[in-house]
Amino acid sequence: MSRLRLPARARPKAAAPRADGWPRAAFDDGFRVDSRLVGGFELAPLSLELMAETERDAALEGLAAFEDAIARPYLLLSVPADRPPHEHLSILEERLDGRRAAAGFSAYAALYRELCAAATRPLRRTYLLLDGASGPELGRVIATIARVAEERGLVVREVSPNEIAGIWGDVARAGVPHRIGVHTGEGDGLLTALALSRRWPAEVAPGWLAGLFAVPGIAAVAMRVRPLARAEAMGFLTTRLRQVRAAERIAAERGELADVERERLGATATDARRAVHAGSGRISFVDTVLLLEAPDRATLAERTEALRLEARSLGVDLETASFRIADAWTAILPGPAPRPIAERNLDSASLAASLLNVASDLYEPAGHLYGRARTSGAPIVLDRFAHASHNAIVLGQTGTGKTMFSGAEMHRCFLRGVRILAVDPLGDYRRLASALGGTYVELGAGDGLNPFALVGTTTERSLSAKLAMLDRLLAAMAGGLSRDERPALDRALRASYTAAGILPDPATHGRRPPTLADVVERLAAEPEGGPLARRLERWATGSLAGLFAASVPLPADRRVLVVGLAAIGDPEVRDVAQLAALSVLWDLVRADLSPKLVVVDEAWKVMRQSSGADFIEELARSARHYHAALQLATQDIVEFLRSPFGEAIVKQCDLRVLLGQTPEGADALVRFFDLTQPERRALVHARPGEGLLFVGRSHTAFEAVVSRREYAMLTTRPADLVAQSQLKCEPPDSS
């Protein structure tokens, strides 16, 4: 497909017309078509098909209000998106650092190319384009539209004159001569134009036209919208209502039965007239045209018939623009509107429901792969660090792919240069850490940590933050604190740090920190602290002393650092150790502003105690301030959502992944996320890796996918692990 790429300062000759009245395009002080300046926006896609009902209604209400605010004619244009695999892969490749990242990228790139090639529904971009006589006039209109879009929560991006020139060149097939016939245009291939008939179904679902986009060969879909002024709309509706009433009287005089279709038209006209009179809606004339292309006549006939069948299934007919192919083609081009092809009236709600920017896939090229959309097969690429909250939560039952998903997220963030910090309760990420050249610290198997150490701290507030964290940790060790024990613990902690020479001054933070045994000794010396000291004794000097008495702090400079807890047999001890590990990793997070991913598997285990839940909620709120992304995963869905902190934590996560559920878990998610019954059934019957992916206000059905290299590093299936041990080889370096 040829493209017209015009530099901003160039002044080329206008394109020669290929039919009478063909528009002329050129650069002057911007991109002009027939001397009219053209500008506009790209509209972000809306994933309506799996939005909850209330969310979908709110989105359509905002879209209707946005379109009502545009008082002049405009063009809604949907064209195929040019999204080659290298657009995303080249961005990721620039960030690779080291041999291990390069090896992982090779497998990742192969997987991504495979997904791009297997997509069943072409990706599309949707534009809202207007024209004006002068730059100041068009600029004022564009500024107004941008402001209204922001007020209504719609994401739009102003397109440059060069981009509009490229769109015009693509749709006009610039540089490729075409001979216009009765039914087709013939050049290097064949194309035809079809228009939606004026008779539409009485009721439509939001985004109902999206089904037409799945037919191969759709080169462009355009809606020419001509809003009517209030007086003009009232006159039109009054005339329409009089016609209906007159027809009803004539039918009654003839003794004919009431016509249901006529009654519907009368009721619709009455409701629309009241809405326009009250100023709560607008009437627009809309002309909808589709451009269909094919390499030969047989294929064109086949695609035309497929498009007609799809349209009939939606309750509308398609009419070929016979003898008016040039007019219909011109109607799709950016610029002033030509003569209408099959114009009909729509109210605000109907126009919003017929939106062209509907999508079921998500694409942010600076991010990384999350899976593929179930409806289109298109790869889902997201950049979590580009969202207001970088956090994510993964909810799924055992065996639904939580570990595989979280491990793949760690690996792909590593490829982007993000530092990986993780707490691994079951030892699932040991092979991943080894393959990435990271450090794996296994508590209970000879390794330990010292939660009292101040690692990488640079401010005077660091000591106060450490004392607050230790208060939570020791409360968890002791099974809670009484009203008298809390001040006693605070005094013992402060005295221990002072005795070690560590003060609020950051210059003292590198000194040897106190130990839990030091704190317990000071508690035992106080009357109020005696019972607490006895409850902490086994952690300080008893059988568990080795867990938190490491003399060397965790390495602060490792790209990948994972703390494993699988060697700790006691579940209660493991929960406390998980909280301690998180506290140490949190010190590393606050040490600098480099991008970091903090993964907490089995998060509910640490949240069962109020001190742990409070700390997780604080991490979720504060992570973005340190350029960190928190990723939580749990299988205890019902307990998590019912907890006092569960809702607050989920609200701090812009990315929410729902994998396979039990019926009880699915019911809890239906209530919490306002899911539909089809979505509930999909979660109950989901295979491993299948589920729903929420991104901000949108969500879509998706399937998580991994390369063979990632699978080898992350699988927990016993059969796979036995096979790997028998082969006695490292995970493969490429897929």
Segments and roles (model prediction):
Residues 1-358:
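Extended, folded cores of ATP/NTP-driven motor/assembly subunits in large transport
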Residues 45-48, 81-84, 426-428, 446-448, ...:
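Conserved nucleotide-binding/hydrolysis micro-motifs of P-loop NTPases
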Residues 378, 386-392, 559:
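Pre-Walker A (Motif I) flank of P-loop NTPase domains
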Residues 31, 41, 53-71, 213, ...:
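P-loop NTPase motor domains
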Residues 293, 321, 371-373, 382-385, ...:
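Generic beta-strand/beta-sheet core signal
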Residues 114-117, 146-147, 161, 392, ...:
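P-loop NTPase motor core of the ASCE superfamily
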Residues 387-409:
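Glycine-rich phosphate-binding P-loop
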Residues 403-453:
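Walker A/P-loop NTP-binding active-site region of P-loop NTPases
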